[in-house]
């Protein structure tokens, strides 16, 4: 065969491959991230029919009762879950729920992928095979051959038990056992890069290749897999690409915080990627107040062009044409712990709608998709549409200024001062670090601002945020729509945001004045008294909003987070810090 013809054939093959890659349908997935250890979230997004109607191609099922916890391991050892035992009955009931979830998804015409923490194994299995699967520290280890053998058996039984399951979403690092009482587990990544490679190759062989099922391997882990380009490539370059193996990556370099960089691992390497986006922002109200983030996710947040200039990409729009772009995965509901709890998921629906519809057709602009949302939700009049658009864009500006800063340096650790339903104070934490206390971070920030003569300016920014929320409340009163419940919730949730950020502004003001007093020995008691009264009135109005409006979300609490159920807080936090200075104003001792 002439060399020129051979060259032409190779060129044709590459062209066809490129065309195939360009015409692949993107994954448009959704997940409800149920709170571990709590009743399942009541939401439309649990319904596969609803997901299908909204254009999703698949459901990530994450109730933390994992599909691989719903198998018996009888082939390995029938004593792991003996016949007639309560443990086996639990497994049987869990398996029936998995089957029902698979049937429901397929009946609706979408695929289903089970969220899977690895390592999670039966407690009895670990006790029986402890010496063969555990390391010197008592942790289950993938460095032990028996552990790998058991996981091969586990995957075999998993897909034999649930042959219609479309695939798995794999998480390492965090291991949630709250909903699996007869199982135990730990992080499998004990040897860095090589642990990931060993696990991914196992999953690729057993799931993608042998069974033609899909693996979404989440990079969310410890040690750099998620946020280090070098680490990510060190792992993925050792893995042969497979059409059923997709890497799943949050759009942020770290967790879903506004001041975090765009993820540098996106687009690099030789594997398909799907991008995770949180809609019910766990560190920013969870849908209790307006917080529209998809303009920032798709086009780039304002801070990426101001206080946090990006070295590389800064938005999904910039990477949508990458050969590795495989779709989007919305976390429509959930993330984090406890509240605030919402009964109206309007703001979650808005974020989920825009990211999923844009992901289906990335040639659309974010604003075009946003306009379609208004069409679908009965926001018809020009004045209402203008007010709603302005409100949503303003909410993104208000949130970063209220929770972090849009003007000044804000360290990546300080963002944890507020999370879930909690407001931290300026004390140093008094519980073990393993409980992930949120107290202590704000004191670090205040110290840095004080030393750099910026504390007053930062506090002024918080006071200015209240004016933005006043504008949002005004705009909410201009929005008319077909659904009266949603129209009412826009108004109530906007007032919620205004009052919460008033509490934050006045709480920060009190703590800042007190902080300066602690440093100098001189407390401006007159000003402290003024802001203490404002702070108390803020809380009174905030509580009245909830009492008078059934649709209002549950309220924030002036405590710092600690990872102890069921309350997830102790006594430290904003309330304790404010009360310290109240006593000083009253003339009492600290």
What are the residue ranges of the model-derived segments?
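Terminal, non-catalytic domain-edge segments
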Residues: 566-590
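Generic recognition of stable, solvent-exposed alpha-helical segments in well-folded globular domains
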Residues: 46, 96, 100, 153, ...
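Positively charged n-region of N-terminal signal peptides that target proteins for export
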Residues: 1-5
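C-terminal non-catalytic alpha-helical accessory regions
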Residues: 321-564
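Aromatic-lined carbohydrate-binding surfaces of glycoside hydrolases
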Residues: 23-254, 258-259, 284-286, 332-360, ...
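Hydrophobic alpha-helical scaffolding
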Residues: 141-144, 189-193, 302-306, 359-363, ...
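Active-site core of glycosidic bond-cleaving carbohydrate-active enzymes
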Residues: 246-336, 444-463
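Bacterial N-terminal signal peptides
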Residues: 6-18
């Amino acid at each position: 065969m002439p060399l020129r013809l051979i060259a032409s054939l190779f060129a044709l093959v590459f062209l066809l491959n490129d065309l195939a890659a360009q015409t692949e349908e993107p994954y448009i997935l959704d997940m409800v991230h149920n709170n571990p250890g709590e009743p399942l979230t009541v939401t439309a997004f649990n319904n596969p029919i609803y997901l299908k109607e909204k254009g999703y191609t698949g459901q990530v099922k994450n109730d933390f009762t994992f599909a691989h916890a719903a198998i018996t391991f009888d082939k390995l050892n029938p004593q792991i879950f003996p016949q007639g035992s309560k443990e086996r009955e639990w497994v049987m009931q869990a398996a029936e729920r998995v089957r029902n979830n698979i049937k429901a998804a397929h009946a609706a015409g979408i695929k289903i992928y089970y969220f899977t923490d690895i390592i999670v194994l039966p407690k009895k299995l670990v006790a029986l095979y402890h010496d063969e699967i555990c390391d010197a520290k008592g942790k289950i280890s993938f460095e032990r051959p028996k552990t790998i053998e058991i996981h091969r058996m586990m995957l075999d039984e998993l897909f034999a038990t649930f042959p219609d399951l479309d695939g798995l979403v794999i998480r390492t690092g965090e291991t949630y056992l709250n909903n699996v009482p007869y199982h135990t587990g730990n992080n499998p990544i004990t040897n860095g890069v090589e642990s990931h490679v060993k696990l991914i190759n196992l999953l690729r062989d057993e799931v993608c290749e042998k069974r033609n099922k899909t693996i979404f391997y989440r990079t969310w882990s410890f040690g750099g897999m998620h946020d280090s380009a070098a680490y990510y490539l060190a792992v993925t370059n050792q893995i042969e690409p497979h059409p059923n193996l997709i890497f799943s990556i949050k759009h942020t370099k770290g967790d879903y915080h506004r001041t975090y960089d765009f993820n540098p691992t996106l687009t690099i390497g030789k594997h398909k990627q799907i991008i995770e986006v949180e809609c019910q922002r766990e560190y920013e109200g969870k849908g209790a107040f307006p917080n529209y983030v998809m303009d920032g996710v798709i086009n780039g947040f304002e801070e990426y062009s101001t206080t946090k200039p990006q070295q590389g990409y800064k938005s999904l729009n910039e990477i949508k044409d990458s050969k590795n772009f495989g779709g989007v995965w919305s976390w429509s509901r959930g993330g984090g712990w406890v509240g605030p709890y919402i009964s109206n998921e309007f703001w979650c629906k808005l974020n989920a709608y825009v990211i999923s519809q844009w992901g289906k057709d990335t040639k659309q602009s974010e604003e075009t998709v946003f306009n379609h949302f208004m069409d679908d939700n009965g926001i018809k009049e020009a004045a209402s549409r203008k007010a709603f658009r302005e409100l949503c864009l303003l909410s993104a500006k208000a949130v970063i200024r209220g929770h972090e800063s849009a003007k000044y340096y804000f360290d990546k650790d300080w963002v944890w001062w507020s999370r879930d339903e909690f407001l931290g104070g300026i004390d140093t934490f008094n519980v073990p670090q393993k409980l992930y206390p949120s107290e202590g971070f704000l004191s670090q920030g205040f110290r840095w601002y004080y030393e750099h003569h910026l504390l007053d300016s930062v506090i002024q920014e918080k006071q200015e945020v209240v004016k933005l929320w006043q504008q949002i409340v005004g705009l909410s009163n201009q929005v008319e729509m077909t659904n009266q419940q949603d129209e009412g919730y826009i108004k109530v949730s906007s007032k919620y945001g205004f009052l919460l950020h008033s509490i934050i502004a006045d709480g920060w003001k009190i703590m800042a004045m007190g902080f300066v007093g602690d440093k100098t020995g001189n407390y401006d008691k007159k000003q402290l008294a003024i802001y203490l009264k404002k702070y108390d009135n803020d809380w009174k109005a905030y509580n009245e909003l909830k009492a008078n409006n059934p649709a209002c979300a549950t309220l924030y609490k002036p405590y710092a987070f600690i990872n102890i159920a069921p309350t997830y807080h102790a006594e430290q936090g904003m309330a304790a810090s404010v009360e310290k200075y109240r006593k000083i104003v009253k003339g009492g001792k600290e």
